[in-house]
């Protein structure tokens, strides 16, 4: 029989919030008796936007902005019912996007 595994992907613009959320998830899973692999840092997506700042449409004056999306991956191997309940009740910051796959 195959082992049950929960894969959690976290995304955020601020890496400090992301790391603290990952630490909370890992601590909760270990406390309930599950085996944890991670958090594994995934490549950061960098989006660059170039905007013309000249009022008359001159091509020489531009301004660039960038947005970085940091990602982490956590695998929870052989989670019990206590682990799933604890993860459902866990309160994480609003800036973190969570994707869970069973």
Swiss-Prot record:
Family classification: Belongs to the universal ribosomal protein uS10 family.
PROSITE patterns in UniProt: RIBOSOMAL_S10
Gene Ontology MF, one: tRNA binding
GO cellular component: ribonucleoprotein complex; ribosome
Coiled-coil annotated residue ranges, if any: none
Official protein name in the record: Small ribosomal subunit protein uS10
SUPFAM superfamilies: Ribosomal protein S10
Pfam families, per the entry: Ribosomal_S10
InterPro entries: Ribosomal_uS10 (IPR001848), Ribosomal_uS10_CS (IPR018268), Ribosomal_uS10_dom (IPR027486), Ribosomal_uS10_dom_sf (IPR036838)
Species for this entry: Symbiobacterium thermophilum (strain DSM 24528 / JCM 14929 / IAM 14863 / T)
Protein task: Involved in the binding of tRNA to the ribosomes.
Subunit structure: Part of the 30S ribosomal subunit.
Keyword field: Ribonucleoprotein, Ribosomal protein
């Amino acid at each position: 029989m195959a082992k049950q595994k929960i894969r959690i992907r976290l995304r955020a613009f601020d890496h400090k919030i992301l790391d603290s959320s990952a630490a909370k998830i890992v601590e909760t899973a270990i406390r309930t008796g599950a085996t944890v692999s991670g958090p594994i840092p995934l490549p950061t997506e960098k989006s660059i936007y170039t905007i013309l700042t000249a009022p008359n449409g001159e091509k020489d004056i531009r301004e660039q902005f960038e947005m970085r999306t940091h990602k982490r991956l956590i695998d929870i191997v052989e989670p019990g019912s206590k682990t799933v309940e604890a993860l459902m009740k866990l309160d994480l910051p609003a800036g973190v996007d969570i994707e869970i796959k069973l």
